[in-house]
């Protein structure tokens, strides 16, 4: 697993494509219109509407460039990988673990950093938990380190998303 790659699921890739399309097709023209309206008001040196629209334009253009870079350098978690019987924890795996410290079962999907969302139990492949369980098998126990309070987990189940 190359840690510095932009790992994306097909779903995450499509979401970024959709966001990019919206920024280019909807947001960019909207800002251009707002800038023109602000210019039509006259003196730009003290025009708050123009300043706000110009700042918004900068944010949109920055996000467009960022998404284009992410998509150009993305490494997709392949459909083949998602359909293969999983024996080891890997990128795209959904893993059920037992956390000895909280005495509870938890389920996480390992995704690239850009798709990580703790509320949806999607953890980054660079997170301490993912690094601890990556490449492990069902039944393996391991310590999650690199955090303030290390803890121990046991892998109960590995499946594909």
From Swiss-Prot:
Ranges in a coiled coil: 8-28
Sorted UniProt keywords: Coiled coil, DNA-binding, Transcription, Transcription regulation
Record-level GO BP terms: DNA-templated transcription elongation; regulation of DNA-templated transcription elongation
MF annotations from Gene Ontology: DNA binding; RNA polymerase binding
Family the UniProt entry places it in: Belongs to the GreA/GreB family.
HAMAP family: GreA_GreB
Role played: Necessary for efficient RNA polymerase transcription elongation past template-encoded arresting sites. The arresting sites in DNA have the property of trapping a certain fraction of elongating RNA polymerases that pass through, resulting in locked ternary complexes. Cleavage of the nascent transcript by cleavage factors such as GreA or GreB allows the resumption of elongation from the new 3'terminus. GreA releases sequences of 2 to 3 nucleotides.
Name of the protein in question: Transcription elongation factor GreA
Gene: greA
